[in-house]
């Protein structure tokens, strides 16, 4: 991961993430108003710069203010390269964890982790600047590993991993991908239930 992103990590170069540039423009009036008039704890959730006005529930460069911070869990990781290398490393570690929980050989787990983390879509969304989307996708395997442990009656570690995965998904603030995670969890639950009934 560090080799792939070495220009960004070691040379200080920046990936020009187009959607981040656009988001800066879309949220500039809101951020200006926030800087001039906001009291502590106040945050505008409406932007007049997009489509003639629409909700703007995640601020420029920050999670929604009502969400707790989980920087103690993933803050060290995001220091590696928040907008590039850390996202891929998150996917590597989390998918490797899922494969280990599923009982896969370590070498196959490593291969699967690389396949997951370096999937073309993940690289495309990094270039586009969909940072929180990439993190939520990267944390999905933690939730799934927790589910697998819960179904194997390993309740303590299953609950810890499941709740940690859900918390990190919500804290990173990409509701669409979290919604897809909920649908995936429901499908897996139905599959386990059908298998259990048979």
Predicted regions and their residues:
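Membrane-interface coil-to-helix junctions
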Residues: 2-95, 114-141
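Membrane-embedded helix bundles of polyisoprenyl
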Residues: 90-102, 106-195
């Amino acid at each position: 991961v560090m080799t792939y992103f070495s220009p960004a990590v070691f040379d200080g170069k920046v990936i020009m993430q187009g959607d981040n540039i656009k988001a800066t423009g879309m949220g500039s009036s809101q951020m200006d108003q926030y800087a001039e008039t906001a009291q502590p704890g106040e945050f505008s959730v409406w932007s007049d710069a997009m489509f003639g006005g629409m909700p703007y529930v995640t601020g420029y460069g920050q999670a929604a203010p009502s969400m707790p911070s989980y920087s103690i869990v993933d803050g060290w990781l995001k220091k590696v390269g928040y907008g590039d290398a850390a996202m891929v490393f998150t996917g590597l570690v989390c998918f490797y964890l899922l494969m280990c929980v599923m009982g896969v050989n370590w070498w196959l787990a490593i291969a699967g982790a690389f396949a997951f983390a370096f999937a073309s879509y993940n690289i495309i969304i990094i270039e586009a600047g969909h940072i929180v989307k990439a993190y939520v996708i990267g944390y999905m395997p933690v939730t799934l590993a927790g589910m697998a442990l819960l179904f194997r009656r390993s309740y303590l570690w299953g609950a810890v991993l499941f709740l940690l995965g859900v918390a990190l998904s919500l804290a990173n603030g990409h509701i669409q991908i979290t919604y897809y995670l909920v649908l995936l969890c429901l499908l897996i639950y139905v599959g386990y239930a059908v298998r259990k009934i048979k």
